[in-house]
Structures are given as C-alpha cells and as structure tokens.
C-alpha cells in the first residue's frame, strides 16, 4: 500500500499540474505557455511541465558566500537573445537652451546602441534515492526534495559566480584608464609603508567618476585580498578611533566612501586543488539596476536571466536507480554593460 501510494502521489501531482495548466490556458495541444505564471513560452518540442513550488525553492536560493549578483544585478528578460541597451553622454553635454519668442524649441534625441547578448542554458538533475526519502519521512522538518534542489542550485550558482568573476577580473574587459596592476611594495600585502590601498581606491573612484559622472558604490575583493587588507597598517590606523578592534567590511566600506564592501569567499575545485573564485583582484564599480523609465544608468554589469528561471521541471521516477530525479534548468548570462563604470586592480596582494 505504501509502495503504491509513494508511486501514485507524484503522478497525481503531475496530472493535477497538467489539468490546471490546461484549464488556465497554460498548456495546450500546440504549445505550453507559462506566460501568466512564469513569463515563458515553449513549443511542443521543448515543452516542460513546471513544478511551481520547487521552482520557487530554486529561484529563492541564495548563497551568502556569492557576491557576483552585487556587481552584476539580475535583470529578467523575455528572450534568450537580444541587445544590451546602452546610452550616450547626452546627460553631461552643455546645450544652448535659450529660445527667442516665436523661435523653434531645440530638440535632443537620446541615442543608444546595443551590444548583443545570448543566454546560456545550464541544466542539472538532483537524484534522491527512495531509501533517503523513506528515512527522512520519519524525521520532522527534513525535506529531501528541497535539499536535492538546493544542492543542484548551489552547483549551478557557483558556475554563475565563476562566470561573473571571470568577466570582472579580466583586464581586457576594461579601458586603458580603468585598470592597474600592483607590483612589489605597492601590493597591499606589503606593510613596509609604501603600499596605500586607500589612495589606490581613490584613484579608481576618480577614474570612474570622470567617465560616467557618478562615484562608484561597490568594492569587491577576493578572500586573499581581504585577509591582507583588513590588517593593513593604513586601514588599522584609520579605524582605531572608532573603538573597534578589527576592520569589518562595513567599516572599510565607510573608509573607502562606498556603500558596499564585498568579500568573495567562494572557492572551486581547480583540477583537484581548491582555488578562490575571485582570486587576488579588487574590482571597483558603480552598479545599479537601470531601467528604460530612468533612461538608463551607467551600470557596470547585469545578469540577464530568462523570466521565471531557474525552474524545476516535474520530478520523475527512475526505477533503475530507485530514485526520484529533480531536473533544474537555468537560462542566464552575465554581461559587462558599461566598462567605464568599473575599475580593476590586479595582483592586489602577492
């Protein structure tokens, strides 16, 4: 009886999802349209029945060690490819706005150019053996399905974090005046008195302000950089008057004159050896979620993600593996929208 019930419940849930989708027009003979719920349109060949509850788990997942979304804010898009909207320098131009009686009013046009973007599809399936489900059912508060989804989403999110870090720490992505490489005693790991992280950050802030008219609001560093930065004599000397024994991200952010000081603690397996995702870099940037209603703001980067993603497809039973399978799919792509809104310090520490 229990075996039959265990097998029947997911099928009943599947049938119910299909019935609800058909009733509300989400599922039809020709296509599966989830626009009303998730903003997704799929043809028959690529049709998926979505588990809305588990998709909510995947979409709400956040790893506190990941900082990429702070430099590349999430922007929902309705297509897997399109143009990145960028705006010109019209806001900073000086116009002759004087008008004589009866004369025509001068006009300006906000021009924009678009760089292409294409979302990447990433999928992974979480496997939960029947035995685990049976044992977890006897312990209140354990949700193996949710745990399986979060494990898969953590892997997908780590890949995205790595992609964001790679974009942000590649010197070729920045214009000539928006990057520098520290060497020798100029590196922040040198405490002999030559290195000066506060001065270096000020140079970066001014380089950004001179090009976009706004001061950066975010500084992001790798874990190795933070380990030295928080102990740097010039940092320690500045914070000693605050009554604090050690530098915190909040204190250093205030010292640098930015809203956010981000520490990239994420690591990844690099051929059997763990390595920091954010390396020995420092990224300074202005990052805000611009909208067309605001006529755009010169943000450093965005993370374009298809509406309603990541999503969890209807779980299915693998009799050979004696497990339930939870497929998770993401359609996402981080992009640098305005490289003049960022500044890269390479080799910040030795």
Task: Annotate each predicted stretch with a short phrase.
Residues 1-32:
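N-terminal, non-cleaved signal-anchor transmembrane helix
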Residues 17, 34-37, 160, 164:
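Polar, enzyme-active/binding microenvironments
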Residues 32-98, 117-120, 183-192, 236-350:
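Sequence/fold signature of self-assembling virion shell proteins
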Residues 112-137:
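Short acidic, glycine/tyrosine-flanked loop/strand segments centered on an H-E-D-like triad
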Residues 130-215, 223-237, 349-350:
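Alpha-helical scaffold segments that mediate packing/assembly in large oligomeric complexes
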Residues 215-218, 280-281:
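Short, surface-exposed beta-edge/turn micro-motifs
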């Amino acid at each position: 009886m229990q075996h039959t019930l265990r097998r029947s419940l997911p099928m009943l849930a599947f049938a119910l999802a299909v019935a609800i989708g058909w009733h509300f027009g989400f599922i039809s003979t020709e296509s599966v349209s989830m626009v009303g719920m998730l903003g997704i349109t799929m043809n028959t060949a690529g049709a998926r029945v979505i588990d809305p509850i588990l998709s909510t788990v995947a979409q709400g997942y956040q790893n506190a060690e990941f900082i990429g979304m702070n430099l590349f804010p999430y922007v929902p898009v309705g297509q897997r490819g399109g143009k990145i909207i960028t705006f010109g320098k019209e806001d900073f131009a000086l116009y002759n706005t004087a008008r004589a009686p009866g004369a025509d009013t001068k006009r300006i046009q906000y021009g924009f150019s678009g760089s292409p973007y294409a979302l990447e599809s990433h999928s992974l399936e979480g496997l939960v053996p029947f035995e685990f489900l049976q044992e977890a059912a006897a312990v209140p508060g354990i949700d193996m399905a949710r745990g399986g989804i979060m494990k898969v989403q953590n892997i997908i999110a780590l890949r995205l974090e790595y992609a964001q870090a790679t974009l942000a720490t590649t010197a070729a992505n920045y214009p000539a005046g928006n990057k520098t490489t520290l060497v020798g005693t100029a590196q922040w790991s040198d405490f002999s008195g030559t290195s000066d992280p506060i001065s270096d950050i000020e140079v970066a802030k001014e380089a950004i302000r001179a090009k976009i008219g706004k001061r950066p609001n975010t500084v992001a560093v790798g874990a190795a950089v933070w380990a030295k930065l928080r102990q740097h004599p010039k940092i320690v000397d500045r914070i000693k008057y605050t009554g604090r024994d050690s530098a915190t991200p909040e204190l250093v952010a205030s010292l640098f004159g930015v809203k956010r000081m981000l520490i990239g603690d994420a690591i990844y397996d690099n051929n059997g050896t763990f390595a920091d995702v954010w390396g020995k870099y420092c990224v300074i940037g202005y990052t805000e979620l611009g909208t067309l209603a605001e006529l755009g703001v010169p943000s450093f980067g965005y993370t374009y993600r298809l509406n309603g993603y990541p999503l969890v497809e209807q779980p299915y039973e693998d009799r050979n593996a004696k497990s339930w399978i939870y497929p998770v799919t993401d359609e996402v792509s981080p992009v640098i929208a305005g490289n003049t809104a960022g500044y890269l310090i390479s080799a910040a520490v030795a």
